Swiss-Prot record:
One GO BP: pantothenate biosynthetic process
Origin species: Methylobacterium sp. (strain 4-46)
Gene: panB
Single GO cellular component term: cytoplasm
Disulphide linkage map: none
Keyword Cytoplasm: yes
Descriptive protein name: 3-methyl-2-oxobutanoate hydroxymethyltransferase
Amino acid sequence: MSHHPDPPATPPASPPVTIPMLQAWRAEGRRIVMVTAYDAAMARLVDPVVDVILVGDSVGNVCLGFDNTLPVSLAMMNHHVEAVARARPRALLVADMPFLTFHLDLPDTIRNAGGFLQRGAAAVKLEGGAARVPVVEALVACEIPVMGHLGLTPQSVNAMGGFKVQGRAVAQARRIVEDAKRLEDAGCFSLVLEGIPAELAARITEALAIPTIGIGAGPHCAGQVLVLHDLLGLLPGRKAKFVRTYVDGYGLLQAGLAAYAEDVRAGRFPGPEESYALPEAVRAALD
């Protein structure tokens, strides 16, 4: 473990990002940048360059070893939201509502979502279409901002038969468009569009006043989101078609770890510069 704690987060130099700011940027045509983060260190890394930080339930398959997001619990999400919030990010902090935390009844849903705001989030994100309208309306009525999520919704992986592009059939495309309009009318301040054809996402973006955030939805959305580990190349193996990897983070980290192991085994680490000297008076007393 480190011999000293992380330094406290420095106060942001620019004002915090707010929901009205995102909506104004959408009207101005300024693209919104959103990434995931799951702890304070990640939040400090991304905060200077992004507009929105999503504490996604993707933490389940990215960090916790699950095959999908379904096993992620409310307690797990609370833990990670608290960790990110401790970094005091300037970016808008959005917390994912995990599976079965907004499906059963409205009082529990409001309590679960409100708990995220009490832990430092500014908004929540939830998956689903028209069936979620009563949930969105109830949350918005309680002053809990909601970001919707349509298209390839990972919590529906079993119903969809896998992680498959949505909206390629006429009826499905029409339903996604209609769901987007209904979620906007219900009070969502933004929508994530995942895994749908680029032209369909463009049509939805044009039809809505609120910003759309794309992931695997082409270049015409009001903003884009990627999992941080994907864009930094921190996960080995096959990537989704929509992922662009900007650096071989996995390779760089492996090289650093290999150099550390080599230095330890060769007796080169730690050296004098990483060691503490014994005061002369103490040495004399011990002799």
